């Protein structure tokens, strides 16, 4: 079923597709394009990586952090752009094996592990901490991978004054507390597939 998901995340021409409803993608671009970010950080590589590089001409550097080796390879093969710094950083503690499980049982086991990643910082510590080791500050941060509640805090610390942090799938309750710590985030409406939440760092 993971292979089928990978196929779904590719467009009809084999290119990486943005896994967002068109309404949410329009909301994202309405925020990002006027911001004219030069340095962008994202946790969770894929269609958004390709979209940023092709549709946001102000970008000089895009740092993208991915935790899944197979998906990292797909993104690396699909995007050839000198502005991209793509990093593979796996979990500090491996997810449970799904060998021999039905698709439903495998999804349940992985979902339980992903929820643990929102509560137990040691599970994805290196993944969350990798951007800080690079010595950059960012104008835009997109949180769309694993351990999002911890990436929110880490990304906020690396954000330039006046910069923007975006969270995808913000309707999930496990992320709410981390976003509220940023001050006055806005949950965008309407949404159909994965809600966006935006917070701007005071200048």
Region spans (language model):
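N-terminal/domain-start segments enriched in small and hydrophobic, helix-friendly residues
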Residues: 28-29, 33-36, 132-141
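Generic enzyme active-site microenvironment
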Residues: 40, 64, 142, 166-167
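C-terminal substrate-binding/active-site "lid" region of AdoMet-derived donor-dependent transferases
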Residues: 128-140, 146-203
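Class I SAM-dependent methyltransferase Rossmann-like catalytic core
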Residues: 1-38, 110-123
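S-adenosyl-L-methionine
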Residues: 76-135
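N-terminal targeting/anchoring "stem" of glycan-biosynthesis enzymes
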Residues: 14, 27, 32, 51-54, ...
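Generic detector of well-ordered alpha-helical packing
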Residues: 43, 67, 145, 169-170
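SAM cofactor-binding core of SAM-dependent methyltransferases
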Residues: 21-97
């Amino acid at each position: 079923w993971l292979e089928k998901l990978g196929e779904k995340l590719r467009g009809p021409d084999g290119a990486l597709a943005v896994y967002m409803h068109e309404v949410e993608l329009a909301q994202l671009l309405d925020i990002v394009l006027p911001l004219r970010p030069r340095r962008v950080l994202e946790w969770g590589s894929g269609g958004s990586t390709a979209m940023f590089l092709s549709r946001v001409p102000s970008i000089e550097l895009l740092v993208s952090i991915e935790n899944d080796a197979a998906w990292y390879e797909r993104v690396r093969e699909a995007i050839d752009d000198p502005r991209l710094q793509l990093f593979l950083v796996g979990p500090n503690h491996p997810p449970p094996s799904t060998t021999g499980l039905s698709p439903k049982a495998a999804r349940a086991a992985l979902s339980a592990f992903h929820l643990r990643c929102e509560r137990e910082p040691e599970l994805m510590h290196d993944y969350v901490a990798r951007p800080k080791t690079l010595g950059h500050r960012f104008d835009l941060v997109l949180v769309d991978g694993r351990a999002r509640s911890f990436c929110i805090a880490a990304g906020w610390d690396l954000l330039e004054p006046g910069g923007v942090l975006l969270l995808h799938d913000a309707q999930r309750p496990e992320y709410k507390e981390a976003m509220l710590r940023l001050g006055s985030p806005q949950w965008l409406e309407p949404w159909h597939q994965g809600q966006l939440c935006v917070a701007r760092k005071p200048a």
